[in-house]
């Protein structure tokens, strides 16, 4: 029995939910999200609580049960409050700036890296070495953050690179002569 899946999702005021078989549409003050789930689960709405149940007793259905509940819970949180990720850029001469619908990264390469910003994600660069990402979809936000981090992942010797705000980078000792 899934400890996550059996918990009901409480729907706060101001959030509308539309259920159409296995498609869930959630709209709120920050926007609208929809997701279609595969079989093996049943989603029902009862007095401001959303319930997710497995249709079969097999391993796949039980795994999808908790996952679907977490995804729907994140959708509700996203349309109500939104999600925010903060990235730090460490390194001499490493900078970020927003130009139009592109994020321009200067990361000690022979060229500047331009990344197109998705329409549902807002980017703010308060300082040259801090990037703040905001959006309603937690999954898309994390994927976009990983695209940015991939441009220059943090390295363990000097700590240069792009990382999440409170991410710990284990440091290594350099060569000894």
UniProtKB/Swiss-Prot annotation:
An individual GO BP term: cytoplasmic translation
GO molecular function term, any single one: structural constituent of ribosome
UniProt keyword list: Ribonucleoprotein, Ribosomal protein, RNA-binding, rRNA-binding
Subunit organization: Part of the 50S ribosomal subunit.
Similarity comment: Belongs to the universal ribosomal protein uL6 family.
Described function: This protein binds to the 23S rRNA, and is important in its secondary structure. It is located near the subunit interface in the base of the L7/L12 stalk, and near the tRNA binding site of the peptidyltransferase center.
Name the UniProt record assigns to this protein: Large ribosomal subunit protein uL6
Protein species of origin: Rickettsia africae (strain ESF-5)
High-level lineage: Bacteria, Pseudomonadati, Pseudomonadota, Alphaproteobacteria, Rickettsiales
Recorded name of the encoding gene: rplF
């Amino acid at each position: 029995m899934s400890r996550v899946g059996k918990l009901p999702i409480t729907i706060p005021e101001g959030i509308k939910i539309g259920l159409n078989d296995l498609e869930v549409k959630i709209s709120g003050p920050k926007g609208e999200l929809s997701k279609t789930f595969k079989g093996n689960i049943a989603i029902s709405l009862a007095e401001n609580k959303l319930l997710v149940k497995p249709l079969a007793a097999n391993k796949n259905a039980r795994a999808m049960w908790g996952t679907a509940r977490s995804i729907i819970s994140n959708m509700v949180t996203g349309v109500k409050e939104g999600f925010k990720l903060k990235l730090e850029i460490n390194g001499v001469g490493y900078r970020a700036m927003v130009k139009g619908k592109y994020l321009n990264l200067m990361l000690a390469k022979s060229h500047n890296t331009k990344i197109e910003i998705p329409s549902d994600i807002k980017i703010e660069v308060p300082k040259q070495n801090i990037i703040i990402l905001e959006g309603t979809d937690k999954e898309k936000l994390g994927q976009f953050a990983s695209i940015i981090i991939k441009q220059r992942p943090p390295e363990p010797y000097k700590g240069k690179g792009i990382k999440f705000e409170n991410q710990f980078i284990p440091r290594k000792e350099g060569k000894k002569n």
